Amino acid sequence: MHFEPALDCALLQKRYKRFLADVTYQSGDTGTIHCANTGAMTGCATPGDKVWYSTSNNTKRKYPHSWEITETQQGHLICVNTIRANQLTVEAIEQGWIKELSGYEQLQTEVKYGHENSRIDILLSASDRPACYIEVKSVTLLDDTEPGQGFFPDAVTTRGQKHLRELTEMAQNGSRAILLFAVLHSGIEKVAAALHIDAKYSQLLKQAQKAGVEVLCYKAEISNTEIKLNSAIAFNNS
């Protein structure tokens, strides 16, 4: 994924009301940008961090600038725009970067499925194999005690729990079901379920794996010009 036009940078003052952030632009002026992330953003929104933002062509938008990447004061790059996780995963599948998901004939997004009124992020299909249901989760929480350790989720997620139940049902019914962690933090080298944050999610994930749900972890190469989801890393839910 290339950023066209190129991203601009500013310094973060504060994030608030979940969807907004005040920044200081390179000109010295201050302003408010949109934050497409409803999560806790732990470690991703420290005042003084550098913010890389895109600019919308829509002149009717109240906040034309969107926060895409955080460059932390420790030098890490983090894609905080949660919309990008699905886009990057679709690109990675189409480019053949995720070898476990090669060979399918059709790719669909946001398809209704399950008994809990869900929409699957990505549905792959082919004439010679079962359908493949893929739920994508963005990982940006870096542990501050163990180098390289990332966790998901960063807050209790009832929505994520629902998705695990739906994936489990798909696997039990004979479809291929995959939970794909899109690691969008340059400092994360391995991923684990955050038992200390959401014990129910960790429990449901173990049950899902026993039922046949596969877990894939792919890490993105991140720069202020391009992001590519193309490197497999380890997952642990022991």
From Swiss-Prot:
Family: Belongs to the SfsA family.
GO molecular function: DNA binding
Segment forming the signal sequence: none
Annotated protein name in UniProt: Sugar fermentation stimulation protein homolog
Pfam families reported in the protein's UniProt record: SfsA (PF03749), SfsA_N (PF17746)
Alphabetical list of NCBIfam families matching this protein: sfsA
Provenance organism: Vibrio vulnificus (strain YJ016)
